[in-house]
C-alpha cells in the first residue's frame, strides 16, 4: 500500500531538489539569513539543523559527512569556526523562520530563515526630543495662558447705501 512521504517535492526532480536545498543551506551558513519561499525555508531548516548537529561533533568524519551536502569550502570553514562556536551549548533549534508578506509577482508565501544566535535586532535611530514650534520657527512667539492674541480690531465696512442697492447692474 502506498504511503505518503513527509518531505515536500518543491516541484523538482530528486537531484534538482537536493541541489536546491544544498545551495540554500550553503547560503544560509555563509550569510546567516536568507529570504526564500516558506516551503523552501521549511525544507532548508531540516537540512541545516542536521548539518549543525553533525558539526557539533567536530570530527573529521563529521566534516566529510557534511561535505556531501555542502560542497563549499568557505561554508565549511564558517560552519566549523564561527557557527559551532556560537551554538555549541544549544541543544537544537538553530534556525528561525519568520513569515513575510506574499511576493508581489506571484503571491508566493515568503519567509526569512536565519540562524538564531546570529540574528541582529534592527538598531533604531535615537529619536530627537520634540521641540516646541516656537523654538523651531525663527522669530515666533509662544502664546501662553488665557492671554488673547494681539490682533488689531478690524473696522467694519460701510453699509450699502439705498441708491447702490436700488441701482441694477447694467450690462455692457
UniProtKB/Swiss-Prot annotation:
Comp. bias regions, Low complexity? 147-159
Q: Name one GO biological process term.
A: translation
- Keyword Nucleotide-binding listed? The answer is no
Q: Is the keyword Translocase in the record?
A: no
User: What are the boundaries of the region Disordered?
Assistant: 127-172
Q: Where is the composition biased (Basic and acidic residues)?
A: 163-172
Q: Which UniProt keywords apply?
A: Ribonucleoprotein, Ribosomal protein
Q: Which GO terms describe its molecular function?
A: structural constituent of ribosome
- Mind telling me which GO cellular component terms the entry cites? cytosolic large ribosomal subunit
Q: What PANTHER family is this protein classified in?
A: LARGE RIBOSOMAL SUBUNIT PROTEIN BL17M (PTHR14413:SF16), RIBOSOMAL PROTEIN L17 (PTHR14413)
Task: State the family named in the UniProt similarity comment for this chain.
Answer: Belongs to the bacterial ribosomal protein bL17 family.
Q: How does it assemble?
A: Part of the 50S ribosomal subunit. Contacts protein L32.
Q: What's this protein's name?
A: Large ribosomal subunit protein bL17
Which species expresses this protein natively? Chlorobium luteolum (strain DSM 273 / BCRC 81028 / 2530)
Provide the gene name from the record: rplQ
Amino acid at each position: 500500500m502506498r504511503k505518503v512521504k513527509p518531505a515536500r517535492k518543491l516541484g523538482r526532480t530528486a537531484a534538482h531538489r537536493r541541489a536546491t536545498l544544498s545551495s540554500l543551506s550553503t547560503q544560509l551558513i555563509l550569510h546567516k539569513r536568507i529570504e526564500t519561499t516558506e516551503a523552501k525555508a521549511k525544507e532548508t531548516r531540516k537540512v541545516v539543523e542536521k548539518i549543525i548537529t553533525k558539526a557539533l561533533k567536530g570530527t573529521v568524519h563529521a566534516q566529510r559527512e557534511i561535505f556531501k551536502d555542502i560542497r563549499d569550502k568557505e561554508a565549511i570553514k564558517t560552519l566549523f569556526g564561527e557557527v559551532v562556536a556560537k551554538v555549541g551549548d544549544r541543544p537544537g533549534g538553530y534556525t528561525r523562520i519568520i513569515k513575510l508578506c506574499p511576493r508581489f509577482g506571484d503571491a508566493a508565501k515568503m519567509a526569512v530563515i536565519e540562524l538564531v544566535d546570529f540574528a541582529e535586532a534592527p538598531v533604531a535611530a535615537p529619536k530627537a526630543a520634540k521641540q516646541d514650534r516656537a523654538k523651531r520657527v525663527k522669530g515666533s512667539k509662544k502664546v501662553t495662558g488665557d492671554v488673547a492674541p494681539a490682533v488689531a480690531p478690524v473696522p467694519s465696512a460701510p453699509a450699502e447705501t439705498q441708491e447702490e442697492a436700488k441701482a441694477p447692474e447694467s450690462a455692457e
